[in-house]
Amino acid sequence: MDILLILTILIVICALAFDFINGFHDTANAIATSVSTKALKPRHAIILAAVMNFVGAMTFTGVAKTITKDIVDPYTLENGSVVILAALLAAIAWNLITWYYGIPSSSSHAIIGAIAGAAIAAAGFAALNYKGFIKIIEALILSPIIAFVLGFILYSIVKLIFKDSNLAKTNKQFRRVQIVTAALQSYTHGTNDAQKAMGIITMALITANLHTSANDIPTWVQFACATAMGLGTSIGGWKIIKTVGGKIMKIRPVNGVSADLTGAAIIFGATFIHLPVSTTHVISSSILGVGASHRVKGVNWGTAKRMLITWVITLPISATLGAIAYFILNMIF
């Protein structure tokens, strides 16, 4: 069998594995608030998230097109198949490490950093599509900041509207609303996160001359990635649910709805303009913004600091892992 075909098959398998892991690693963030407030039972939340992630993944492909062509040029990438496989293995390794320790790291940072690191190892810094790459990095940096500010503002407005309401009654009403916002957040998660694997597989198909257009995501790729993420979601990432849903702040239904709406708005906005963002950090930052508006001292800033450190180090670490994986695979293939 042709070595290029073997590499492409391995890439498809690893990309679907990445999406599967992304499902149980990142989807915890989308349902963490609804589980922590008991708006949904854990198993019901997981099923809801799995279905909505699948639906979201089947709805859009704009982010996939960005991943396909804006980090590196798939048509000219030197030793492209090895680069892509190395990036996937590096991102999967980092995701599993952070999942094991219950750290809400970003699959987006991991795969984007790993692709950049592997491409630089293969062909130097000239391999990067700087215009597209910088645009992606800007989105990754700005989106959690915007989420924090928007979460703070939205919850401040909610507090003002319900300042004279009975707290217990208000939370009971918001608990019902939170089922809807959890579904919405899971849907938007699927519209952005599942597309990263779609873009990677399409990039690999172009590199192997099995596909021609970076602006056309094959239907089978979209369906396979949506299914992988849905299945991964069905397993659930309980360690990360505990961190996002309880260790940042004590979340009440009114807090959860505000955070869910903020996160969903930012993620869907990014999807609409075809930009990949870290759903992990957007959702976590939304909760931090809501928490700061509710009561600054009520936020566990130690957990927030640990998440911030992970946010900062994921790109360089995944880039380094991508480069190391490339050098190893290049000796094999």
Curated annotation (Swiss-Prot):
Cellular component annotations (GO), alphabetically ordered: plasma membrane
GO biological process: phosphate ion transmembrane transport
A Pfam family reported for this protein in Swiss-Prot or TrEMBL: PHO4
MF (Gene Ontology): phosphate transmembrane transporter activity; symporter activity
Catalyzed reactions: phosphate(in) + H(+)(in) = phosphate(out) + H(+)(out)
Keywords: Cell membrane, Membrane, Phosphate transport, Symport, Transmembrane, Transmembrane helix, Transport
Transmembrane residue ranges: 1-21, 44-64, 83-103, 110-130, 136-156, 217-237, 263-283, 308-328
Annotated membrane topology: Multi-pass membrane protein
Location relative to the cell: Cell membrane
Function text: Low-affinity inorganic phosphate transporter.
PANTHER family given in the database record: PHOSPHATE TRANSPORTER
Family: Belongs to the inorganic phosphate transporter (PiT) (TC 2.A.20) family. Pit subfamily.
Protein name in the entry: Probable low-affinity inorganic phosphate transporter
Source species: Bacillus subtilis (strain 168)
